């Protein structure tokens, strides 16, 4: 991949800089990193040169023609990336022919030709869909690809992934060959029936993301520095919210790889905020509900009489005075209200659990080498609220885990 070769050359440049300064350990570190990213004969020779000089303590000899060509090539690549191949007085071209051809290949398709856009067959798996999206998104991101219509191609790839990664939207598309959003009401009603009739039930919040937010959810931890990004469900008709600004400059994303790891506190801060928000919102929700409908999910001095719903045996509490005033019809309606509210709470908590598990898996996979032990633990994380949702008769799906 071109981006891997460029990163390898950047590491070679840093290694040569440290070698000239006599810092052999740092030079060796970046030279070895270059080989891991993109192995070359020149890189291997350079590592041997550094090790030899480290043992002898001799200064850096005059660069060989091969090394000079390597440095010139790196400088030229930097120049092409920043200024483009252009002569004086002409408009600067900031893209390569390969980038331009890729853009033209994508935009030649119609907006709803999702399989063709991602270069996939209709029998493709979820893993193949994710791999294709990640590859194309990196090549077409507007901060990386400046070819004409690259932004349009990037949006088409994002849209194709959003449809094909959602089993319900994909099934609708396979049946009709049309954009599922062109018949939003029909798709919504069909989805509600598949989910047990629960309004606004969806375990795929990425369907509501913008192309940039979708890209950040895949690559944010690897390409960005600064505050983290996290998501939470917001009740019926789930929406996705993003917190913490991220710079758009693509070069800064790559430089972030060399930054020291954040402290555990800053890594866990987004999760702490999500949990705190969920606790406060659920507390206020339950409190207001108990006032309006005269029941509570928690027993207290006012609500002392234990009750359970008829359908799912969900426990709640009432006061004896209020209970005596209710007719059998009122009690039946109250039971329906309790079950609906309880299901909403569990549904939102399930989405949060799925997002947390997905974040843990992505963090364990890393950028170059996965942490196998951490990845195993992340995959084994239980989702108790999702299990409860299944017990209530609702179908749930994994929130796009990266297995």
Swiss-Prot record:
The modification Phosphoserine is found at residue 58. Residues 55-88 have a biased composition (Polar residues). The chain crosses the membrane at residues 263-283. Residues 113-177 form the J domain. GO terms for biological process: cellular response to misfolded protein; chaperone cofactor-dependent protein refolding; protein folding in endoplasmic reticulum. Gene3D superfamilies: DnaJ domain. Pfam families: DnaJ, DUF1977. GO terms for molecular function: Hsp70 protein binding. The keyword Disulfide bond does not apply. Keywords: Endoplasmic reticulum, Membrane, Phosphoprotein, Transmembrane, Transmembrane helix. It is found in: Endoplasmic reticulum membrane. It comes from the Eukaryota. One of its GO terms (cellular component) is endoplasmic reticulum. Residues 55-95 are annotated as: Disordered. The keyword Manganese does not apply. It is a single-pass membrane protein. This is Uncharacterized J domain-containing protein C17A3.05c.
């Amino acid at each position: 991949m071109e981006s891997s070769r460029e990163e390898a050359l950047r590491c070679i440049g840093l290694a040569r800089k440290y070698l000239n300064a006599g810092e052999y350990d740092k030079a060796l570190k970046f030279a070895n990193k270059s080989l891991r990213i993109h192995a070359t004969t020149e890189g291997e020779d350079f590592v041997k040169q550094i090790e030899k000089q480290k043992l002898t303590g001799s200064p850096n000899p005059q660069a060989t023609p091969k090394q000079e060509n390597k440095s010139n090539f790196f400088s030229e690549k930097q120049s092409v990336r920043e200024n483009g191949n252009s002569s004086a007085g002409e408009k600067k071209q900031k893209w390569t022919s390969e980038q331009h051809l890729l853009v033209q290949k994508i935009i030649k398709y119609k907006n709803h030709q999702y399989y063709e856009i991602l270069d996939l067959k209709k029998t493709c798996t979820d893993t193949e869909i994710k791999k294709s999206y990640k590859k194309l998104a990196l090549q077409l991101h507007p901060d990386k690809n400046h070819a004409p219509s690259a932004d349009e191609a990037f949006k088409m790839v994002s849209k194709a992934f959003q449809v094909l990664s959602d089993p319900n939207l994909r099934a609708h598309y396979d049946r009709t060959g049309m954009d599922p959003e062109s018949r939003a009401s029909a798709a919504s009603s069909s989805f509600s029936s598949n989910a047990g009739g629960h309004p606004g039930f969806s375990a795929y919040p990425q369907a509501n993301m913008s192309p940039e937010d979708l890209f950040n959810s895949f690559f944010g931890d690897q390409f960005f520095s600064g505050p983290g990004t996290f998501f939470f469900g917001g009740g019926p008709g789930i929406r996705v919210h993003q917190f913490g600004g991220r710079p758009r400059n693509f070069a800064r994303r790559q430089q972030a790889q060399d930054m020291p790891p954040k402290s555990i506190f800053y890594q866990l801060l987004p999760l702490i905020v999500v949990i705190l928000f969920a606790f406060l919102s659920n507390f206020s929700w339950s409190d207001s509900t108990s006032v309006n409908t005269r029941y509570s999910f928690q027993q207290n001095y006012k609500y002392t009489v234990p009750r359970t719903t008829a359908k799912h045996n969900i426990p709640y509490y009432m006061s004896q005075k209020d209970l005596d005033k209710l007719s059998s019809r009122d009690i039946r309606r109250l039971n329906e209200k309790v079950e609906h509210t309880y299901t909403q709470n569990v549904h939102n908590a399930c989405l949060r659990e799925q997002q947390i598990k997905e974040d843990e898996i992505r963090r364990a996979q890393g950028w170059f080498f996965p942490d196998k032990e951490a990845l195993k633990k992340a995959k084994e994380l239980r989702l108790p609220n999702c299990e409860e949702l299944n017990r209530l008769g609702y179908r749930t799906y994994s929130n796009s885990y990266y297995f």
